Amino acid sequence: MQAVLLVVALFGAALADPPKQIHLPTPKVKRVEKLAHQEHAVNVVQAVPITKTVVRTVNVPKTLIQEVPIHVYTDLVLKSPVPRRKVIDIKKTVLQPHIRHVPVDQPYVVHRRVPVIHTKIVRQPRPVHRIVKIPKLKVVQKQLNRIIDVPQIVTKERIHRVIKPVPVERTRIQHVDVDVPMRVVVPEPVVQDRHTQSVETVPVPHDVVRKVKVPKTFVLKDLIPVPEKAGRHYSSDK
């Protein structure tokens, strides 16, 4: 029975009308425009791909040019040369021509503008005085009551006296660094006259005779034959 009903239901479903398909319209996109006024800014987020830039550090040798300031000191203390008198040799000076005094460098004076003070630090003892004030001392003596033969209470007041001491001055030795002036030999400014030459007048005795070079004369008297050297023969034709 159930099989018969199942077969009838299948035939009825096959012969029935097909179901209708309902096509619904696609919903439209709703667009809302907002004016970007200056007082109402809108955040704009852009999807920008982040790329990592790899930087390679290369040590490139370069010439280092550094300007070094040059200090020119014009106030330095110069050491003056020791004056030495020129020893005059009479034999070489008498027969020499006269050389006039020709100064090459003008005399100049080396001035020391700032006085030079040299000191050295020496550790020396120095007494340091300090006044010590002693506090006041209050001496209080208490007399106890004692019972004597007579039944009478003996009371004495406490003795209260103040000792006012005199301030005491204490002295201790303290080692401090003291600048002690030094004796330094500094050259004094002098006038220098260098690169000069002169000739002093030397008294010439009368017995000094000036030597004069006399040219030698040769007189040819006889012809002297030239000796022949070994290994060389000279012909008479030449």
From Swiss-Prot:
Residues 1-16 form the signal peptide. It is found in: Secreted. Prismatic layer of shell (at protein level). Expressed primarily in the mantle with highest level in the mantle edge and lower level in the mantle pallium. Keywords: Secreted, Signal. One of its GO terms (cellular component) is extracellular region. This is Valine-rich protein.
